[in-house]
Curated annotation (Swiss-Prot):
Catalyzes the transfer of a dimethylallyl group onto the adenine at position 37 in tRNAs that read codons beginning with uridine, leading to the formation of N6-(dimethylallyl)adenosine (i(6)A). The record marks T105, R127 as: Interaction with substrate tRNA. ATP binds at G14, P15, T16, A17, S18, G19, K20, S21. Its EC number is 2.5.1.75. It holds the Pfam family IPPT. The keyword ATP-binding applies. This is tRNA dimethylallyltransferase 1. Belongs to the IPP transferase family. Monomer. Its cofactor is Mg(2+). NCBIfam families: miaA. Keywords: ATP-binding, Magnesium, Nucleotide-binding, Transferase, tRNA processing.
Length: 309
C-alpha cells in the first residue's frame, strides 16, 4: 500500500548572477505559480540593492514569499528557513498554485528537502575517509554499505548521490543511529517533497562578466547609500548580515579604510569566489538538471510542465 503523494515543488538554483529570479518569474507566469525565496540575504529587510532582490516589477507580476521577513540583526538559520518555507509552500498548494523555490543558498535548499542533522564531533575526519573509500570502491559499494545499516534511507538515494550516501554512513558511524530514524523522530521524512531541480548553467567567463556588470550597477544605483542607512539605523558592521559580500566592503569604505576603486574590486573578487563555492555545492548534486537560460527556456518549460502533470 502506497502513502499519499508527496507535494511537488520546482527548484531553480545556480550561482549568483545566473538569472534565477528572471527565470523563476517567467516560469511562474507560465505555470500559474508563486515564488519562495531561498536566498539567505534576501530574507533581510533594508538589504535590497546589495542582495539583488527581485525588482518591483517582478514582485508585482508574481507573488513572492520569504522576502523581507527579518531585520539584519535577527539570525535566520537553515532550520528557520525550512519551517517558514514549508508553511509558504503549504499555503501556495492550498490556493491551487505551484510552488517555485528559487535561490542560491544550498544549505537552505538541503534543509527544506531533507532536514538537518547536527554534525557530531569527528565528522570531518570520518567524511574524508569515507570519500577516499568511495573513490576506491565506487558509489554502488558505498550505497550497499549504507543499505546494511539504514535500508530505509538507502532506498531513497540514487547511486550517483554520493553526498547523501556519505552523510548517512557518517551519522550512523558517529551516533549509532540511522539517519532515517533521526529524521523521523525530528519531524523530517526521508523525502518531504517530490522536487524537480533546474540549475542555470552559465559559461564561467560569461558568469564573471555578469558579476562585474551587476556590481557596477549596484554601486551606481545606491549600494553605499543603502549601507549608510543601515548603519545609521543601528545595524552595526559586526552583524553577520552586515559582513556579507557587498556590505562588508561598503562598511570598510564608509569607515575610510578603502578607496572606491578598491571597494569595487573587492566586491567583484569576493562575489566571484562565492559563485565558485556555489557551483561546487550544486555540482555535487546529481539530481539537478543543468540547462542554459535564456537559450533553453522552452526545454526548461517542457521539463516543468511534464513534472507537474
Amino acid at each position: 500500500m502506497t502513502g499519499p503523494a508527496l507535494p511537488r515543488i520546482l527548484i531553480i538554483c545556480g550561482p549568483t548572477a545566473s538569472g534565477k529570479s528572471e527565470l523563476a518569474v517567467r516560469l511562474a507566469r507560465e505555470l500559474d505559480g508563486e515564488i519562495v525565496n531561498a536566498d539567505s540575504m534576501q530574507i533581510h529587510r533594508g538589504m535590497d540593492i546589495g542582495t539583488a532582490k527581485p525588482t518591483v516589477g517582478e514582485m508585482g507580476a508574481v507573488p513572492h514569499h520569504l522576502l523581507d521577513v527579518a531585520d539584519p540583526d535577527r539570525p535566520f538559520s537553515a532550520a528557520d528557513f525550512s519551517d517558514a518555507a514549508s508553511q509558504a509552500i503549504s499555503g501556495i498548494i492550498r490556493r491551487g498554485k505551484r510552488p517555485i523555490v528559487v535561490g542560491g543558498t544550498g544549505l537552505y535548499l538541503r534543509a527544506l528537502l531533507h532536514g538537518l542533522v547536527d554534525s557530531p564531533s569527528g565528522a570531518g575526519e570520518l567524511r574524508r575517509r569515507l570519500q577516499e573509500e568511495a573513490r576506491e570502491l565506487g558509489n554502488q559499494a558505498m550505497l550497499e554499505r549504507l543499505r546494511r545499516v539504514d535500508p530505509q534511507l538507502a532506498t531513497t538515494i540514487h547511486p550517483n548521490n554520493l553526498v547523501r550516501i556519505i552523510r548517512g554512513l557518517e551519522v550512523y558511524h558517529l551516533t549509532g543511529i540511522p539517519l532515517s530514524r533521526y529524521q523521523h523522530e525530528h519531524g523530517f521524512a526521508a523525502e518531504r517533497y517530490r522536487s524537480l531541480a533546474i540549475g542555470i548553467r552559465v559559461e564561467r567567463r560569461e558568469l564573471y562578466e555578469r558579476i562585474e556588470r551587476r556590481v557596477d550597477r549596484m554601486l551606481a544605483t545606491g549600494l553605499l547609500d543603502e549601507v549608510r542607512a543601515l548603519l545609521e539605523a543601528g545595524f552595526g558592521p559586526e552583524l553577520k548580515a552586515m559582513r556579507s559580500i557587498g556590505y562588508r566592503e561598503s562598511c570598510d569604505f564608509l569607515a575610510g579604510n578603502s578607496s572606491l576603486e578598491e571597494t569595487t574590486a573587492l566586491i567583484k573578487r569576493n562575489t566571484r569566489r562565492y559563485a565558485k563555492r556555489q557551483l561546487t555545492w550544486f555540482n555535487a548534486d546529481p539530481e539537478i538538471i543543468w540547462l542554459e537560460y535564456p537559450e533553453k527556456f522552452a526545454t526548461i518549460l517542457r521539463h516543468c510542465i511534464a513534472f507537474f502533470e
